[in-house]
Regions:
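Short, charged/polar connector segments at secondary-structure boundaries
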Residues: 1-57, 68-149
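Short, glycine-rich nucleotide/cofactor-binding loops
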Residues: 60-61
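Short, conserved phosphate/pyrophosphate- and ester-handling motifs at nucleotide-, phospho-/glycolipid
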Residues: 64
């Protein structure tokens, strides 16, 4: 088991939310999305997946655009979300600061989307003194896809 050392108050809650309340900030790689959907169709119903990571103030998806679009494809109305304090200084939109979190929020608020994989959100691990993928904050959840196929 891996433990990431970060301020626990960054994760504000884990909730099941209406999928239509979430806001994307970037496009997806279409062939990657279709491959993911095809893969999910091959599973025998039961799936364990990482929750979508979302800003608790803006409802912007921080991590999980392909998962979000796949779940929407299957008609799920409510999905588990790990809400975070996106404005935390421990979170960056990319390892090398090529894009800022405020730029992402501004782009979403303008009604536009970034190109696929324009961001790669990371969180600072105090123990390792390094930035790690923000996916590590995600919670795992179980659902049965047979209800949606």
């Amino acid at each position: 088991m891996y433990f990431i050392d970060f301020p626990l108050e960054i994760v504000t809650s884990i909730q099941e939310v209406d999928i239509d309340t979430l806001r994307c900030h970037e496009e997806v790689v279409e062939n990657r999305l279709s491959s993911f959907i095809d893969y999910l169709k091959t599973l025998d119903g039961d799936i364990i997946m990482s929750s979508i990571i979302v800003c608790d103030e803006t409802m912007i998806i921080v991590d999980g655009h392909h998962r979000y679009h796949a779940l929407k494809h299957f008609g799920l109305n409510k999905i588990p979300v790990t809400f975070i304090k996106y404005n935390s200084p421990e979170i960056k939109a990319f390892y090398d600061d090529r894009i800022s979190k405020s730029e992402i929020v501004d782009i979403v608020n303008s009604g536009k989307l970034l190109s696929p994989k324009s961001s790669k959100h990371v969180i600072f691990d105090k123990k390792l003194n390094a930035y790690l993928p923000i996916l590590l904050l995600s919670s795992m959840w179980h659902f049965n896809l047979k209800k949606y196929k």
